[in-house]
């Protein structure tokens, strides 16, 4: 779900202030295991502010789908309908690929990008999961990704051959990005458009032009 892995919790919540687990959620409210009520202004607050937890209309649709059977050997018509809707919203794309997680979606995007670029090296900004291509940034220096959401990401098990194939730059630091592109044969730029910092000095326009 949208709450991420519990292994990330120590980096995001203060002990003894915010609970580890919930027993119930409704609207913007959550209850811990001791039935204490909280307003959720945390990770999932973006979702809860739009429709809220346990939205009656969504619950009704989910229950209906479960009763019809939500898994089969065949694909569901909803998959086709959603793909059709997405390509109508974004006519520049003629195909849709669904993924189960954000990390998987990023890995797919990187593979497609590398397949279509002569220069395979990547300049990256922000957090993009735990797949080898991303974590390889930390092979040379385990602190390279410390300013990109989660500190101390472990690279044990990541092939050492991936060293010096992906390079990190900080948001709004266009000069570093431009330098990387010149020195490291960068063919792909992977970044979050915005997280908690607004772009400055036409940063996004400069990146697109680059």
What are these regions (language model features)?
Residues 40-43, 187-194:
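Short beta-strands and strand-loop turn motifs
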Residues 19-41:
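Active-site and channel-lining beta-strand-loop segments
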Residues 173-179, 191-210:
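Active-site core of PLP-dependent enzymes with the aminotransferase class I/II
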Residues 6-7, 48-50, 132-137:
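Adenylate-forming
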Residues 37-119:
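Glycine-rich loop-to-alpha-helix module at the N-terminal edge of alpha/beta enzyme cores
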Residues 73-74, 100, 168, 195-198:
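Alpha-helix capping and helix-loop boundary segments enriched in small/acidic/polar residues
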Residues 1-24:
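Active-site-adjacent loop/helix segments that line or gate small-molecule/cofactor pockets in enzymes
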Residues 81-187:
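PLP-dependent aspartate aminotransferase-fold enzymes
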């Amino acid at each position: 779900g949208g709450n991420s892995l519990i292994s990330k919790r120590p980096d995001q919540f203060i002990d003894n202030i915010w609970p580890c687990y919930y027993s119930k959620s409704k609207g913007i409210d959550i209850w811990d295991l001791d039935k204490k009520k909280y307003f959720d202004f945390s990770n999932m607050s973006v979702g809860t502010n739009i429709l809220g937890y346990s939205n009656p209309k969504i619950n009704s649709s989910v229950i209906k789908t479960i009763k019809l059977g939500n898994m089969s050997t065949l694909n569901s018509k909803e998959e086709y309908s959603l793909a059709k809707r997405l390509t109508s919203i974004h006519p520049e794309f003629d195909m849709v690929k669904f993924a189960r997680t954000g990390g998987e979606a990023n890995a797919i995007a990187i593979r497609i990008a590398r397949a279509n670029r002569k220069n395979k090296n990547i300049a990256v900004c922000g957090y993009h999961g735990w797949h080898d291509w991303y974590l390889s940034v930390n092979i040379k220096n385990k602190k390279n990704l410390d300013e990109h959401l989660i500190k101390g990401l472990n690279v044990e098990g990541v092939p050492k051959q991936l060293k010096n194939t992906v390079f990190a730059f900080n948001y709004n630091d266009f000069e570093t990005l431009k330098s990387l592109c010149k020195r490291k044969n960068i063919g792909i730029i992977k970044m979050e458009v915005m997280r908690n910092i607004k772009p400055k000095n036409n940063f996004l326009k400069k990146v697109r032009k680059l």
